[in-house]
Amino acid sequence: MAEIIDIHAREILDSRGNPTVEVDVLLDSGAFGRAAVPSGASTGAHEAVELRDGDKTRYAGKGVLKAVEAVNGELFSALSGLDATDQLLIDQAMIDLDGTPNKARLGANAILGVSLACAKAAAEEAELPLYRYIGGARSHILPVPMMNIINGGQHADNPIDVQEFMIMPVSAPTVADAVRMGAEVFHALKKKLKDAGHNTNVGDEGGFAPNLASADEALAFIVKAIEAAGYKAGEDIVLALDAASSEFYKDGKYVLAGEGKTLDAEGMVKYYAELCKRYPILSIEDGCAEDDWAGWSLLTAELGAKVQLVGDDLFVTNPLRLAEGIRKGVANSILVKVNQIGTLSETLEAVEMAHKAGYTSVLSHRSGETEDSTIADIAVATNCGQIKTGSLSRSDRLAKYNQLIRIEEELGPVAVYAGASILRG
């Protein structure tokens, strides 16, 4: 038995300089696990609750001492003496102790920190890498990265409405080559933007945040950068968008303020369809707002056969929301963010449900990240084949890419890079 003898949380800072929770778990054998919890900027209304202090005299109210206290008090008392290898038992005990449907009492940031740190300690106890401990012997698929190289929306101080413009190096033979290709395009894009007189400051996720007039202009710059780096757009590298459309959905309309457009759901679907005709876009995340089920139905009918339609705010990594989407036949992919649901067990349940229904899944970071690279291991553990973890700058993003490179090296000849086969179209 891998007995839990100590759990300790502290308040640390994330990549935006905001407080977050870090948790240490110690087992009786001396095995140890540590996990830091990420935080989002564009958060879905149906996400599990991130507990903040609200004390305006500390961190402008964003402190997490209440969550830290929950870990060091109630959660430690409840879990002390339990077997760290029984992940389901641990996670259910915390869910029951919290007693709310969205983890609002103790905080998803408190519960998730403990959940992930327990898994890491158990992996060390078993003398297994985390991806192997979570996923078992069949964990061997390295994910295609979605690299966010132009930032807009809530992730940047510019007029671009669409939040993320991403590249996916699908022709790479390995994940190490995919990272190299992404870095080459990133630097080519920097030169293209600079030559055109744009700033090359970066946003929250490490992508550039130039003052461009439209999504079309951003995509045109990216295609030029792909070509300048020596690759073919649509063959070597395909494009992906995260519209984060809940952020510009107002009174039943999609208000693209940067482009001066106000569209209904049908107009928004036509907007995406036109972009997909002009550019090799094979994935669109949150193309419609989180509760615009009718809009999602239109989008799925129009583009679902040839484009991956990813539900982030729509599903919030919640098996109940995902089950509703599957019943209604909307979207065809789920974005997986561990802090949206708040435990490792529920995260894995959502991925399994998606795969059984024929949906793809994409492991994802948040805009507020740390050096913690756990999601890289979870991506390999679940064989999900795709990961979203930012651009090719900022060490909080690169920590995940570097971990994937290490995992690929460790797996050796059994490692398989997912490549283009993971996508529709």
Swiss-Prot record:
Cofactor remark from the record: Binds a second Mg(2+) ion via substrate during catalysis.
Record GO terms (molecular function): magnesium ion binding; phosphopyruvate hydratase activity
Keywords: Cytoplasm, Glycolysis, Lyase, Magnesium, Metal-binding, Secreted
Disulfide-linked positions: none
SUPFAM superfamilies the record matches: Enolase C-terminal domain-like (SSF51604), Enolase N-terminal domain-like (SSF54826)
Catalytic site: E205, K337
Binding site for Mg(2+): D242, E285, D312
Pathway(s) of this molecule: Carbohydrate degradation; glycolysis; pyruvate from D-glyceraldehyde 3-phosphate: step 4/5
Binding site for (2R)-2-phosphoglycerate: Q163, K337, R366, S367, K388
Enzyme class: lyase
E.C. no: 4.2.1.11
Keyword Transmembrane helix assigned: no
PROSITE patterns referenced in this protein's UniProt entry, alphabetically: ENOLASE
Compartment list: Cytoplasm; Secreted; Cell surface
Reactions it catalyzes: (2R)-2-phosphoglycerate = phosphoenolpyruvate + H2O
Listed GO biological process terms: glycolytic process
Gene Ontology CC terms: cell surface; extracellular region; phosphopyruvate hydratase complex
Cofactor (UniProt): Mg(2+)
PANTHER family, per the entry: ENOLASE
Function: Catalyzes the reversible conversion of 2-phosphoglycerate (2-PG) into phosphoenolpyruvate (PEP). It is essential for the degradation of carbohydrates via glycolysis.
HAMAP family membership: Enolase
NCBIfam families linked to this entry: eno
Family: Belongs to the enolase family.
Name of the protein described by the UniProt record: Enolase
Species assigned in the record: Rhodospirillum rubrum (strain ATCC 11170 / ATH 1.1.1 / DSM 467 / LMG 4362 / NCIMB 8255 / S1)
Protein encoded by which gene: eno
